[in-house]
Amino acid sequence: MFYMLGKRRRMSRIMKNGRTVILPMDHGITKPEKGIEKVDRVVEEVQDYIDAVIVHKGVAKRSAVLADIDAALIIHLSASTSLAPDPNDKRIVTSVEKAIALGADAVSIHVNIGSKTEAEQIEKAGTISEICDDYGIPLLAMMYPRGSIDVTTETVRHAARIGYELGADILKVPYVQSFEEVVAVCDIPVVVAGGSKGSEHEFLKRVEDAIAKGAAGVAAGRNVFNSDHPVRIAKALHMIVHGNMHMEEVMEYEGNMVVG
């Protein structure tokens, strides 16, 4: 499937036995959420339970931790802010070449399907996927139905397929109950997004359900770094994704660790 040696080698750092736990900490440009100011501390604490970290270039070049951990480094290329007239208008703020210079194992982009600038975002994604092919570096595409489009099985399925058609190597999409229909439309790894911070119980149940329906893992940021117990949550994700454990088993193993 991944026909180039460079991509295959780098993908193996992200995907372990076909599964992955990714920690996105690229939220600081959008809005400085609680915990985002402690990237190094959070990554150092949870490093045993994650396979990859997503950050922007500014964080990567200043980090004292990212160069010394086993987790893969993914540099995020897209950005917009919550203060903008159109927060869904994602713009490219760095290059694949810069990401490689920073030591990236992969790059990621965010595409908002249904937004006013959907066409421009799709065009950029297509160009970036070709550059990634040239350098043998995997592309993770975060594909979201946004704007006036509701998050439904059909819209998420369509968004995922767009990312696949554009040349992405991994897809990150929102959770829907019929996640198996999303997975079925693409023969590349599809990871479920963690979503906004909420109940630990509900969050972990969503992840468990997505894994049971074919998800290749989870990319969860706010539910980890915004938690009062990030290590506990990261460990639970690792047990569900890599250990095929049910949430009830995780709770029993950890002594009813999930309280929310």
From Swiss-Prot:
InterPro entries cross-referenced by the UniProt entry: ADH_synthase, Aldolase_TIM, DeoC/FbaB/LacD_aldolase, DeoC/FbaB_aldolase, FbaB-like
SUPFAM superfamilies: Aldolase
NAD is among the record's keywords: no
Gene3D superfamilies: Aldolase class I (3.20.20.70)
Catalytic activity: 1-deoxy-D-threo-hexo-2,5-diulose 6-phosphate + L-aspartate 4-semialdehyde = 2,3-dioxopropyl phosphate + 2-amino-2,3,7-trideoxy-D-lyxo-hept-6-ulosonate
The EC number(s) this enzyme carries: 2.2.1.10
Catalytic-site annotation from UniProt: D26, Y144, K172
Enzyme class of the recorded protein, top EC level: transferase
UniProt-listed GO biological process terms: amino acid biosynthetic process; aromatic amino acid family biosynthetic process
Highest taxon, organism lineage: Archaea
Subunit details: Homodecamer.
UniProt family annotation: Belongs to the DeoC/FbaB aldolase family. ADHS subfamily.
Function: Catalyzes a transaldol reaction between 6-deoxy-5-ketofructose 1-phosphate (DKFP) and L-aspartate semialdehyde (ASA) with an elimination of hydroxypyruvaldehyde phosphate to yield 2-amino-3,7-dideoxy-D-threo-hept-6-ulosonate (ADH). Plays a key role in an alternative pathway of the biosynthesis of 3-dehydroquinate (DHQ), which is involved in the canonical pathway for the biosynthesis of aromatic amino acids.
Official protein name in the record: 2-amino-3,7-dideoxy-D-threo-hept-6-ulosonate synthase 1
UniProt organism field: Archaeoglobus fulgidus (strain ATCC 49558 / DSM 4304 / JCM 9628 / NBRC 100126 / VC-16)
